[in-house]
């Protein structure tokens, strides 16, 4: 049960959730950059600049209040002056700051998901030990309880809802 659901299914879910969340940004890029460039009204360099703006806005919105510390850290590592406005932050500083912020959020979600399952493991292990069943692996008994809990609380619904809330706040 280590790969349930399979990796391909998880990748598909991640892909379509990304499309859902990023659709407004992709639409803005299409309207401001790709469409004018394909019509020949702007050059490739202008199209790049126009496409970069919606992505920068999206990343800044995701960083929120606590994301500024990542920008400050990367600016300090690059020996650059601290930015006064968001436009002062180079894209090569903004991207890793955004990635670190998202990894931090993902780790927090993972820990929150893990806590109920580890509690179930500890309770089952305690019960098995008190019954003198030391040779029976607790995971073998606790797995059905974990699956039942996940289904009863609508785990996939809660997980996707919290992911969207963390992105769309």
Predicted regions and their residues:
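Hydrophobic alpha-helical segments and their helix-loop boundaries in membrane
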Residues: 1-169
């Amino acid at each position: 049960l280590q790969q349930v659901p399979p990796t391909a299914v998880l990748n598909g879910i991640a892909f379509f959730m990304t499309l859902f969340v990023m659709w407004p940004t992709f639409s803005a890029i299409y309207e401001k950059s790709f469409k004018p460039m394909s019509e020949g009204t702007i050059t490739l360099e202008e199209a790049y600049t126009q496409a970069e703006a919606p992505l920068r806005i999206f990343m800044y919105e995701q960083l929120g209040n606590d994301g500024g510390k990542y920008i400050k850290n990367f600016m300090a590592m690059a020996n650059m002056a601290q930015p006064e406005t968001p436009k002062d932050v180079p894209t090569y500083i903004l991207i890793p700051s955004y990635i670190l912020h998202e990894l931090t959020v993902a780790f927090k979600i993972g820990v929150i998901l893990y806590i109920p399952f580890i509690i179930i493991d500890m309770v089952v292990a305690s019960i098995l030990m008190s019954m003198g069943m030391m040779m029976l692996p607790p995971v073998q008994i606790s797995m059905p309880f974990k699956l039942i809990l996940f289904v009863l609380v609508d785990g996939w619904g809660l997980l996707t809802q919290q992911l969207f809330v963390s992105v769309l706040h």
